[in-house]
Amino acid sequence: MWLKLFFLLLYFLVLFVLARFFEAIVWYETGIFATQLVDPVALSFKKLKTILECRGLGYSGLPEKKDVRELVEKSGDLMEGELYSALKEEEASESVSSTNFSGEMHFYELVEDTKDGIWLVQVIANDRSPLVGKIHWEKMVKKVSRFGIRTGTFNCSSDPRYCRRRGWVRSTLIMSVPQTSTSKGKVMLKEYSGRKIEVEHIFKWITAHAASRIKTIYNVEHLKEEWNKSDQYWVKIYLFANLDQPPAFFSALSIKFTGRVEFIFVNVENWNNKSYMTDIGIYNMPSYILRTPEGIYRYGNHTGEFISLQAMDSFLRSLQPEVNDLFVLSLVLVNLMAWMDLFITQGATIKRFVVLISTLGTYNSLLIISWLPVLGFLQLPYLDSFYDYSLRLLRYSNTTTLASWVRADWMFYTSHPALFLSTYLGHGLLIDYFEKKRRRSNNDEVNANNLEWLSSLWDWYTSYLFHPIASFQNFPVDSDWDEDPDLFLERLAFPDLWLHPLIPTDYIKNLPMWRFKCLGVQSEEEMSESSQDTENDSDSDNMDTFSSSKDIFEDKQSVVHSSPGRTSHCDTEACSCANKCESSPCERKRRSYGSHNTDEDMEPDWLTWPAGTLHCTECVVCLENFENGCLLMGLPCGHVFHQNCIVMWLAGGRHCCPVCRWPSYKKKQPYAQQQPLSNDVPS
């Protein structure tokens, strides 16, 4: 998780540097910055109208370019970044969707139950044509949608009873606006009563109703009273301008931030004495002033602070966020971090997506579970001071120059989603390259075959589904599945796969360990002479003995090789069992489990073996004989192996005996010990 968080922070740093790089390129090619002011005199009439469209100011009665330019200057300073965004938005030919209401409940759910937005609904009466034609309605939808106003069409033929109850007997336009200045207050419906069915007149009607909710100040005395008043609003934003009404984007934001930020419009059109504004620090007109308990902040002096809906919305959200804003932000960050697993995970393609889906589900579940106590914590009545200090910290941090850069980059990348996704993909491919290079340098095995990985995944699932998770030393002896079938059924009903994903290997250090010793060890020459004499003298006498030993050895090999899901031997070069020996080998002629005997001086010292172990002279993992001084290890089932061989076997995830498949961490009833008798072998 920390690795993914580091890569995500690194990605954000790359985005920040990339944005500065783009700014440098634009400055090198054009010699201008995004924060550089634009002189409206140098703009064409079309560009001036585009700026007014984005700010939400009507210009239908202004035929001259001079009047349009003055209206742009009265609404606020124009920056290069705002001009670029406005022209790009005007060139975009994307169609905006409009809702078609199916009936009363649909209308109530979206319009009347929505407390923090404006709706414009065209009602089409039965057997009547719509009030606004299709072409004009599409223009209307595109014009109002840039200010966050949602649109829809209600055809009375789908629910005539509701239309009669509402009194909609003719086609009309309905506008829904929050009635009170409190958050989630009541909604009032207003019907358009104008005679001119034109886009500009309808838009002026909408903006007039939206502006009526904003507190307007017309004289100095009212301004003094409002400026010195302290009420429930900690954050207030003032617009000092020489306009008849505030721009539409300002009115739309006042509805969106109802209950969080108070919007105040100061109309200085007929003011003769403006000395008081100088006293409170207002020197330029127009001015957007943010007043908080910490002081006054002049909006528009930093990077990305344009006179537009998107820029001011991003600015106010960072200062006075809702809990939903924080949740959405955390959701985006967590999912971006989870998607890093697609590039960090190495191996098969299916493996990458399986790990990705698992990570997405885990991270999102943990996020939702973590937010539940946070929501309950915020509703406690004794945390008002904590809430106030948190908002104050946000206001301090988000009014800095660095925060303005971050907001500007956020608007830039959200308006160019293809660039955002391509940089994320490139960053992920770089992570994948370096991670693959690191694993190759560490000689880590990477399984790139989908079928092999699926097979190993199935083996992993079945292994942990049926094997109990218990330590070797603490697991009771009498809890055997063979003796208690109910435990096996309970195991199937409640698997420990998602509760305990790994079997602990601490039990390995508790397994019995000792060295293989012979009662008498001869030199190599004597051993070879003795073996030759023994071979020549006992060809006829011990033929039955050797044949029976061969049969037992073949039976043992068939058992070992027929065990599913494991490797029955290891390479001679890789097995270091022979290097652990201290002296010459103790040759054996019979290699079966049980009691064995040859000459008395060649007999293994069985007394040094722990109780409950099966006597044998060969390791079935590497298929080599035990040699004098070799380190041995026994399993709970009683079978004995080279210590190095069985540790490698268990560390590879195969927690069972290579011979009988008994779990290596589970105790077993000891076998009846078979003591070797020297007089059992015929002479």
Swiss-Prot record:
The keyword Zinc applies. It is found in: Endoplasmic reticulum membrane. Pathway: Protein modification; protein ubiquitination. The chain crosses the membrane at residues 6-26, 326-346, 366-386, 411-431. CDD domains: RING-H2_RNF103. The keyword Glycoprotein does not apply. Pfam families: zf-RING_2. This is E3 ubiquitin-protein ligase RNF103. It catalyses: S-ubiquitinyl-[E2 ubiquitin-conjugating enzyme]-L-cysteine + [acceptor protein]-L-lysine = [E2 ubiquitin-conjugating enzyme]-L-cysteine + N(6)-ubiquitinyl-[acceptor protein]-L-lysine. Gene3D superfamilies: Zinc/RING finger domain, C3HC4 (zinc finger) (3.30.40.10). Residues 525-548 are annotated as: Disordered. It comes from Mus musculus. One of its GO terms (molecular function) is zinc ion binding. It comes from the Eukaryota. Interacts with DERL1 and VCP. InterPro entries: RNF103, Znf_RING, Znf_RING/FYVE/PHD. It is a multi-pass membrane protein.
